[in-house]
Amino acid sequence: MPVPLQIGPLGPSDVEGVRGLARAAETADGVAPLSEQPLLRLSSDEGWLTHVVARSKAGQVIGYAQVDRGGEDASAELVVHPEHRRAGVGGLLLRTAERDATLPQFGGTAGHHGKRLRVWAHGNLEPARAFAAAAGYVVVRELLFLTKPFPPVVAPVEPTPPVTEPVEPAPPVVEPVEPAPPVVEPVETTSASTSGVVSTGSTTGGGSTTGGGYRVRAFVPGVDDDAWVALNARAFAAHPEQGRLTVADLHDRMAEPWFDPAGFFLAEAPDGTLAGSLWTKVEGDDGEIYAVGVDPAHQGRGLGATLTAVGLDHLATRARRATLYVDGDNAAALATYARAGFVPTAVDVQYGKATGGTPVPRALPSR
């Protein structure tokens, strides 16, 4: 039976339907099928974004794909309801995404616009690997999920007061009384003395100073927004997702319940410009190093390591484990995080048509 498709912006009921679909898939698979960015963009009507909804005969949302043509390559994320899999819905969504990847960035007629489609598979589960192989797709990018447990916080234990047994009083001993010597009163003398405690301290405007005159402080909403977006674009100029964040994207994240400016750290250069940043995100027992980046003009000074240490200290009292994502081909970052005690526990992958790429890898354990 043909599956009706709805292509275009989503209304409020559509958004709730897609969120319900994602929850059902996560319950069945043990991993969220859609990442944060597509969920934040469910209500977006940007011209470079396509929403594809598949419905059952009864009108239930049973499949969803989101196609993003804003980057160098088009990327897509898709999900099918667990009760409607192996019925052609996934293939229909993928073919629609492939067609839409050829559209111009801001809509229009399909054609050859140089957009290669990259499809995310979160967790890279066995059904996703089989689906990708059948469609002629191979892995072109790996995003590793690293974790590090924090030692448990042990509350101080109040010492138990000793139990004192009552002591029977000893009978008085009567000694013979010697005659008392004469009492000589001491002569008081007057002397002048001084004592005092000298304390010194310094303030840095709410932050702490690092080597080279850099200062680490917290993000100030409404003040640092534009400067941080510009810094982020410089730090992630080669990153296909992070480097494209806009002020509107920043504000979307600031509206999320997990946002806490006290866990959003900025490194200022001696001249006051932003040189680096680290953003943390706490949800449940997980404390994520959400994004850490350093302006290329300030790299090589240890700012990344300094910011990471500050972030981990912040998270240690707020979460049971630290988490972060890093590209699988970033050997330097992987080595740094391994030395810090992080280990890979899951992987998200991007698939592309088999004109290059690597064989489908074995999935890591679920988060």
UniProtKB/Swiss-Prot annotation:
Ranges where the record places region Disordered: 185-209
Pfam hit, one: Acetyltransf_7
GO biological process: mycothiol biosynthetic process
Residues annotated for acetyl-CoA 2 binding in this entry: V292, G293, V294
Domain N-acetyltransferase: 5-151, 214-365
An annotated Gene Ontology molecular function: mycothiol synthase activity
Subunit structure: Monomer.
Family: Belongs to the acetyltransferase family. MshD subfamily.
Protein name: Mycothiol acetyltransferase
Native source organism of the sequence: Xylanimonas cellulosilytica (strain DSM 15894 / JCM 12276 / CECT 5975 / KCTC 9989 / LMG 20990 / NBRC 107835 / XIL07)
Gene: mshD
